[in-house]
């Protein structure tokens, strides 16, 4: 009669489940990375949406021609902003005191875009970018 060992030797078939387990873990971690990437993109999109909504709210507060208690669409806000800018430009162009003065020299935009000193933020409100 042969003696049987209570501990079975590891056979090749016994190793397969651990390899499958590692593969499943790897697939799970790849899936988790994909989900995490998707969540990050979703959060970035949500942040951008909040930034845009904040910019529209600021425009709505700044332009006096927009009724404060009336719900207006984003397109209406932009139309009011354009009209307000045109009105301000017309007021500047036709102001009698300004007509008599020598127009100030204006720095070309190309100089502003290339000058690193122009990139300095002066006020806290200037640091908020409406993308």
Swiss-Prot record:
Summary of the function given for this chain in its UniProt record: Transcriptional regulator (lacking a basic DNA binding domain) which negatively regulates the basic helix-loop-helix (bHLH) transcription factors by forming heterodimers and inhibiting their DNA binding and transcriptional activity. Inhibits the activity of both neurogenic (neurog1/neurogenin, neurod1/neuroD) and myogenic (myod1/myoD) bHLH factors.
Induction: By bmp4. Inhibited by Notch-signaling.
Expression sites by tissue: During embryonic development, expressed in a number of neural tissues, including Rohon-Beard neurons, olfactory placode, eye primordia, and the trigeminal ganglia. Also expressed in other organs including the pronephros and liver primordium. Pronephric development begins by stage 25 and increases during tailbud stages. Expressed in both the tubules and the duct. As embryogenesis progresses, expressed in the migrating melanocytes and lateral line structures.
Complex and partners: Heterodimer with other HLH proteins.
Name of the protein described by the UniProt record: DNA-binding protein inhibitor ID-4
Biological process terms in GO annotation: circadian regulation of gene expression; negative regulation of transcription by RNA polymerase II; neuron differentiation
Record key words, sorted: Developmental protein, Nucleus, Repressor, Transcription, Transcription regulation
Cell location: Nucleus
Predominant localisation class: nucleus
Keyword Transmembrane: no
Record-level GO cellular component terms: cytoplasm; nucleus
Record-annotated bHLH domain positions: 36-88
GO molecular function, one term: bHLH transcription factor binding
PANTHER family for this protein: DNA-BINDING PROTEIN INHIBITOR (PTHR11723), DNA-BINDING PROTEIN INHIBITOR ID-4 (PTHR11723:SF6)
């Amino acid at each position: 009669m042969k003696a049987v060992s209570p501990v079975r030797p590891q056979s090749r078939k016994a190793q397969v489940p651990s390899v499958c387990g590692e593969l499943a873990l790897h697939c799970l971690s790849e899936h988790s990375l994909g989900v995490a990437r998707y969540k990050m993109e979703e959060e970035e999109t949500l942040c951008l949406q909040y930034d845009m909504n904040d910019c529209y709210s600021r425009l709505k507060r700044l332009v006096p021609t927009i009724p404060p208690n009336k719900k207006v669409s984003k397109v209406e806000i932009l139309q009011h902003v354009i009209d307000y800018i045109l009105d301000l430009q017309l007021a500047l162009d036709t102001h009698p005191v300004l007509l008599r003065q020598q127009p100030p020299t204006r720095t070309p935009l190309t100089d502003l875009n290339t000058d690193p000193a122009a990139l300095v933020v002066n006020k806290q409100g200037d640091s908020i970018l409406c993308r």
